[in-house]
From Swiss-Prot:
Zinc-finger ranges (unnamed): 63-80
Family: Belongs to the geminiviridae capsid protein family.
Organism: Potato yellow mosaic virus (isolate Venezuela) (PYMV)
UniProt keywords, alphabetically: Capsid protein, DNA-binding, Host nucleus, Host-virus interaction, Metal-binding, T=1 icosahedral capsid protein, Viral penetration into host nucleus, Virion, Virus entry into host cell, Zinc, Zinc-finger
UniProt protein name: Capsid protein
InterPro entries named among the record's database cross-references: Gem_coat_AR1, GV_A/BR1_coat, Viral_coat
Length: 251
């Protein structure tokens, strides 16, 4: 015997809502709104006062827009003895990739690329780890110091590298990471993807020269040190390094 229709079905302008369209997770259609999502995405006026007073500004303090960008694209031959490159080289000018005056702030650093081995090396059974150090040089002078001049190592092993005691005030390691490649006929991994994004807020100061060189820095140069653990087998890094910076209002 069929069930009797509910009295509201006969009312004008009403219809039965299908259970398949109730936005349940099993149906797979439509957004599913719950109290947790509403609380996370609540408007700013419903958040505590500390969220409103201590918000991180898009533009660093003491700087002005627009956000500018400088890219460094290069293939590096990474050695066991280490390598260094300056990533705060910005030429003075009026473009979106230039600095207006002597001072600017590097808000963030984006490193992407890959570590790889050539055809001859990847057939050998070995593991090679490549380490990167993002270092701030507070008092740059002359040319960048080599890896062995800045870092103290045990048995000349880069994996044990720490900044020398007498240079800890000048060189500050802001971030470090590593990538690993493996060679051999079986289970080899001949390349590794590199992708890092850091917020640094590093205030760089140049002298009166216009060229973007390390020798023209006077304060807070950004250096990227690289070294590999294997002494005989070389490894390469194809990197694109982008810095996002703002000009200082003191220029």
């Amino acid at each position: 015997m069929p069930k009797r229709d509910a009295p509201w079905r006969s009312m004008a302008g009403t219809s039965k809502v299908s259970r398949n369209a109730n936005y349940s997770p099993r149906s797979g259609i439509g957004p599913r709104i719950n109290k947790a999502a509403e609380w996370v995405n609540r408007p700013m006026y419903r958040k505590p006062r500390i969220y409103r007073t201590l918000r991180t500004p898009d533009v660093p303090r003491g700087c002005e827009g627009p956000c500018k960008v400088q890219s460094f694209e290069q293939r590096h031959d990474i050695l066991h003895t280490g390598k260094v490159m300056c990533i705060s080289d910005v030429t003075r000018g009026n473009g979106i990739t230039h600095r207006v005056g002597k001072r600017f702030c590097v808000k963030s650093v984006y490193i992407l690329g890959k570590i790889w081995m050539d055809e001859n090396i990847k057939l050998k059974n070995h593991t090679n780890s490549v380490m990167f150090w993002l270092v701030r040089d507070r008092r740059p002078y002359g040319t960048p110091m080599d890896f062995g001049q800045v870092f103290n190592m045990f048995d000349n092993e880069p994996s044990t590298a720490t900044v020398k005691n007498d240079l800890r005030d000048r060189y500050q390691v802001m971030h470090r990471f590593y990538g690993k490649v493996t060679g051999g006929q079986y289970a080899s991994n001949e390349h590794a993807i590199v992708r890092r994004f850091w917020k640094v807020n590093n205030h760089v100061v140049y002298n009166h020269q216009e060229a973007g060189k390390y020798e023209n820095h006077t304060e807070n140069a950004l250096l990227l040190y690289m070294a590999c653990t294997h002494a005989s087998n070389p490894v390469y890094a194809t990197l694109k390094i982008r810095i996002y910076f703002y000009d200082s209002i003191l220029n």
